[in-house]
From Swiss-Prot:
Belongs to the RecR family. The gene is recR. This is Recombination protein RecR. InterPro entries: DNA_Rcmb_RecR (IPR000093), Rcmb_RecR (IPR023627), Rcmb_RecR_Znf (IPR015967), TOPRIM_dom (IPR006171), TOPRIM_RecR (IPR034137). A zinc finger (C4-type) spans 57-72. It comes from Geobacillus kaustophilus (strain HTA426). The lineage of its organism: Bacteria, Bacillati, Bacillota, Bacilli, Bacillales.
Length: 198
């Protein structure tokens, strides 16, 4: 189908988003076309603002508009425990259950030799540096329960063994092959409670 150039560019832009194919992108573009101009401008401003003002916390790697993030700044949090997750969305999922009160470390990925992602490509070195500076007694590995997440957890566990820091893995109330961000609060809570030492 041939669309006018501005509409075609919008469709192409929507297709850059994960899970958006040509039909959905066209449907979204036509929806934008039907919206009031002030609503479209507000939407465009929100996109620009997110890109300009949201960045990663220099301590934990979570998304934030301040540095450090609100979690790292919160003195009431348990600074003896760090929960290691793959993605900022996992922090949001863990926070939703309102049971974990420690700190986080976001790896921004998982070890995946098939995709050419090694330990040096994710934030493992930053975790090791952080563990030297803080009084951490336990590291909870909450990577996804899939091959990449397990490989990452085992790799970090082996690295931390000589440090004397207790290393635990969240229990698998989570489905194998699933993503942490999609788990409900009860499942996440039970997985955290049932964590095991590695």
């Amino acid at each position: 189908m041939h669309y006018p150039e501005p509409l075609s560019k919008l469709i192409d832009s929507f297709m850059k988003l994960p899970g958006i194919g040509p039909k959905t992108a066209a449907r979204l573009a036509f929806h934008v076309l039907a919206m009031k101009e002030d609503t479209v401008l507000e939407f465009a401003k929100a996109l620009v603002d997110v890109k300009r003002h949201i960045h990663y916390c220099t301590i934990c790697g979570h998304i934030t508009d301040t540095d450090p993030c609100y979690i790292c700044k919160d003195e009431r949090r348990d600074r003896t425990t760090i929960c290691v997750v793959q993605d900022p969305k996992d922090v949001i999922a863990m926070e939703r259950m309102k049971e974990y009160n420690g700190l986080y470390h976001v790896l921004h990925g998982a070890i995946s030799p098939m995709e050419g992602i090694g330990p040096e490509d994710i934030k493992i070195a930053e975790l090791l540096t952080r563990l030297q500076d803080e009084t951490v007694q336990e590291v909870i590995l909450a990577t996804d329960p899939n091959i990449e997440g397990e490989a990452t957890a085992m790799y970090i566990s082996r690295l931390l063994k000589p440090t004397g820091i207790k290393v635990t893995r969240i229990a698998h109330g989570l489905p194998v092959g699933g993503d942490l961000e999609y788990a409900d609060e009860v499942t996440l809570s039970k997985a955290l409670e049932g964590r095991r030492e590695l």
